[in-house]
């Protein structure tokens, strides 16, 4: 499935491709950098999301183009994706000038063998930290666990009722709850506390 990607003015600058076969080795293919497209600064859905973000003061960040299109189909216009997993400072700074708060909606991925967290959680750990360090107010809407089955915004949020059922949590509190283990050794607990304190330093007083 070929999906056009537009810049903030609505001009097509590249295409992203989504495999329709669930057994495909590569799920997504993105366009290469060129004179009119730079992956590190491009944002999928930005042409629609910016106007809505100015009105709501909030932007929802998901992982893939189908996630954006699913939420747009439900009337949620202020949603974007980086199409690469990692958000760059250049991409996030686009929302700084509008004073937007950011809310991440990670995929629910089953952790790989030996891993404590799934890829979707790691996506938010990394990008939520960057956004917090840049001075954004950050929150998370987490898709509930479905056992061994992967769920993303496209497959789970199929109605406004599903959307409204997702509770929104402060990123730092969510991050702390994910990492802190009351039964862990003292030194491990102290590492988590120090990590959370590093995040709290970036919180701006209102």
Which functions belong to the PLM regions below?
Residues 1-102, 115-123:
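Phosphate-handling DNA/RNA-contact segment within nucleic-acid enzymes
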Residues 84-103, 110, 130-132, 176-185, ...:
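A compositional/structural signature marking long, glycine- and acidic/polar-rich segments
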